[in-house]
């Protein structure tokens, strides 16, 4: 039996795991669009909002950012 997920989104905690603040909304938007149009969510929740579901999936490592090596070049090197 699958467990229902209760979730409290903390964007700052998500940024600690994924340090690409501009990539996170893009990934979430693309996943939310997929959920809305054709994809089955990876998590079970009472929340029906595709954006909330996509954030849950990203936070719980059900989805990830592809080509992360390319994004690493965009992180500024601050001294």
Curated annotation (Swiss-Prot):
SMART domains tied to this protein: RNA_pol_Rpb6
Disulfide bonds: none
GO molecular function: DNA binding; DNA-directed RNA polymerase activity
Assigned EC number: 2.7.7.6
Entries under Gene3D superfamilies matching the protein: 3.90.940.10
Organism domain of life: Bacteria
Catalytic activity: RNA(n) + a ribonucleoside 5'-triphosphate = RNA(n+1) + diphosphate
Keyword Transferase in record: yes
Nucleotidyltransferase listed as a keyword: yes
Keywords attached to this entry: DNA-directed RNA polymerase, Nucleotidyltransferase, Transcription, Transferase
Any single Gene Ontology cellular-component annotation: DNA-directed RNA polymerase complex
Subunit-structure text: The RNAP catalytic core consists of 2 alpha, 1 beta, 1 beta' and 1 omega subunit. When a sigma factor is associated with the core the holoenzyme is formed, which can initiate transcription.
Function: Promotes RNA polymerase assembly. Latches the N- and C-terminal regions of the beta' subunit thereby facilitating its interaction with the beta and alpha subunits.
Annotated family: Belongs to the RNA polymerase subunit omega family.
Protein name listed in UniProt: DNA-directed RNA polymerase subunit omega
Gene it is expressed from: rpoZ
């Amino acid at each position: 039996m699958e467990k229902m997920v209760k979730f409290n989104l903390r964007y700052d905690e998500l940024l600690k795991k994924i340090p690409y603040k501009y990539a996170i909304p893009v990934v979430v938007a693309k996943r939310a669009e997929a959920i809305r149009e054709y994809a089955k969510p990876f998590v079970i929740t009472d929340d029906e909002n595709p954006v909330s579901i996509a954030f849950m999936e990203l936070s719980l490592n059900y989805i990830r950012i592809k080509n992360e090596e390319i994004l690493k070049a965009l992180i500024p090197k601050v001294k």
